[in-house]
Regions:
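Transmembrane helical elements of multi-pass membrane transporters/channels
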Residues: 9-25, 131, 194-198, 202, ...
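Small-residue-rich hydrophobic transmembrane alpha-helices
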Residues: 40-100, 139-158, 253, 264-330, ...
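Helix-terminus/linker motif at the lipid-water interface of multi-pass membrane proteins
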Residues: 23-41, 110-119, 175-184, 243-270, ...
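Short runs within selected transmembrane alpha-helices of multi-pass transporters and secretion channels
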Residues: 61, 131-150, 158-169, 187-202, ...
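N-terminal transmembrane alpha-helices
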Residues: 2-30, 34-35, 51-63, 67, ...
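Residue-level hotspots within the lipid-embedded alpha helices of multi-pass solute transporters
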Residues: 18-19, 55, 95, 99, ...
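Short alpha-helical transmembrane segments in multi-pass integral membrane proteins
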Residues: 1-14, 68-135, 179-236, 292-358, ...
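Interfacial/gating helices of multi-pass transporter permease domains
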Residues: 32-51, 119-124, 184-185, 189, ...
């Protein structure tokens, strides 16, 4: 079904797109770092909440992408387009509701999650949260559109849009942060504008009826409950899984926030570097949805095994390469941040721990489960993620970071323990082949 050329055309733009997506967060942090560590800390704390909400949009988009991919594999393009339209409406509705809630309750949420943090950190966090919330609908619509393009095997279009969005973001940061000294507000405004532009462009492109999947008469709402149910069968468990994952990260961030501004900043910078480190793996995981989803639609289970193994080998190769490269140039990379010596040392310490664990188990913990999701085996991945997160990541974070007084290093070691547990579970599940029994959704 997919030649090596087809896989390259799908994967390479995805890697570039994911690199650019993570760059937005890194550029924000690097540029705001010139305004002081309080601004960096404020953005970091809000982003832990943002990621929780944004992951819901991504999960819904994944549900739509899986259904669309399966219909494409079956050759039913009309149903694929119908699924796309339902995904658009659902994404817009969910993001609008969450955006309104975040705008009006941002201060109580910040106080509830992070408790008493320094006043200047809270000031930056509040304005960043407000502007981020306004951008939620744009981001949700863009995520939905990007997922649909990937379902068609067209990741080049989303890559080009991502390049434009990042250009807008970087230029906006330069003007608002350096020119107008807007700090966190400037970073959030630039991101808001870039997301709005991306959402508009990708929606317009999907109105073209010549595409395999397109938005048919978007101005005339039509809700097909059976189709929406199929999307939600994937999106809801995936959303719960990812939400639990982000809630766990927020709880860990609340532990880190108790160690002071230096620890918060080190955790934020190390988090940015860690995201960059696994970008190729994230891209391969996204490609897994498209490839396996279409194989599932065609009911070709041998192809599922073949392409999953092939993509996993590629994932391991690129994660190893990226990790070695970043460790070799870690000092040069950290020099872009305006960090104190103590913060730099702490950042480097946890980044090394992450690198060692990433090359061993990250692909099994985060790329392989996408093959299960593409086969609709989302309940299993949700249950494993829920148990692993709460038992290992959160439980061991309290034990290592607080009881054994290891600080943020303890939270990162706990994260690695979580990875090993979930990775083992996903390997066993895929090998046993139970996903074949729930692999196709028929309306």
């Amino acid at each position: 079904m997919f030649s090596n050329k087809d896989l390259r055309k799908l994967i390479i733009p995805l890697v570039i797109e994911q690199l650019l997506a993570v760059t937005i967060g890194m550029v924000d942090t690097v540029m705001v770092s010139s305004c002081g560590e309080a601004a960096v800390s404020g953005i970091s704390l809000v982003d832990s909440i943002n990621f929780l909400l944004i992951t819901l949009f991504s999960s819904l988009a994944t549900g739509g992408a899986v259904i669309a991919s399966q219909y494409i594999g079956r050759g039913d393009h009309k149903s694929a387009s119908l699924a796309a339209k339902q995904l658009f409406y659902a994404s817009l509705a969910l993001s609008a509701v969450l955006g309104v809630i975040a705008v009006f309750f941002r201060k109580p949420v910040l106080n509830m999650v992070f408790g008493s943090i320094e006043a200047d950190v809270m000031a930056h966090a509040q304005i960043y949260f407000l502007l981020s919330a306004i951008s939620y609908p744009f981001l949700a619509v863009y995520n939905a559109g990007a997922a649909l393009f990937r379902s068609m095997g067209d990741s080049r279009t989303t890559m080009l849009i991502s390049i434009l969005m990042n250009t807008i973001n970087i230029v906006g940061n330069a003007i608002l942060i350096y020119g107008f000294q807007m700090a966190a507000a400037g970073a959030a405004t630039a991101s808001l504008v870039s997301r709005a532009v991306g959402a508009i462009i990708i929606t317009v492109l999907l109105l073209n009826p010549r595409r395999i999947i397109f938005y048919d008469k978007l101005h005339k709402p039509e809700i097909h409950l059976s189709m929406l149910k199929s999307i939600l069968q994937i999106g809801v468990p995936n959303g719960l899984e990812n939400s639990i994952f982000q809630i766990g990260k927020i709880l860990v961030a609340s532990i880190v926030s108790g160690f002071g501004t230096i620890s918060i900043t080190a955790n934020a910078v190390a988090g940015n570097l860690a995201s960059l480190q696994v970008i190729p793996g994230m891209a391969l995981g996204m490609a897994m949805i498209t490839v396996v989803g279409q194989c599932i639609g065609a009911k070709d289970y041998e192809a599922v095994k073949k392409y999953t193994k092939k993509l996993m080998l590629i994932t391991y190769g690129v994660v190893w390469a990226m990790t070695l490269l970043m460790l070799l140039f870690s000092k040069q990379i950290l020099s872009f941040y305006s960090l104190s010596e103590e913060t730099t040392t702490m950042t480097m310490e946890v980044f090394i721990v992450h690198g060692i664990c990433a090359v061993i188990v990250w692909p099994l913990a985060f790329a392989l489960p996408n093959a299960l999701r593409a086969a609709n085996d989302v309940r299993f991945t949700m249950i494993v993620s829920l148990l692993s997160m709460w038992i290992f990541r959160i439980g061991f974070s309290y034990i290592l970071a607080i009881y054994f007084n290891m600080g943020i290093l303890g939270t990162w070691i706990a994260m690695c323990i979580d990875w090993f547990c979930r990775g083992a579970c996903f390997v066993i599940r895929f090998a046993r082949g139970k996903w074949k029994n729930i692999s196709f959704i028929d309306n």
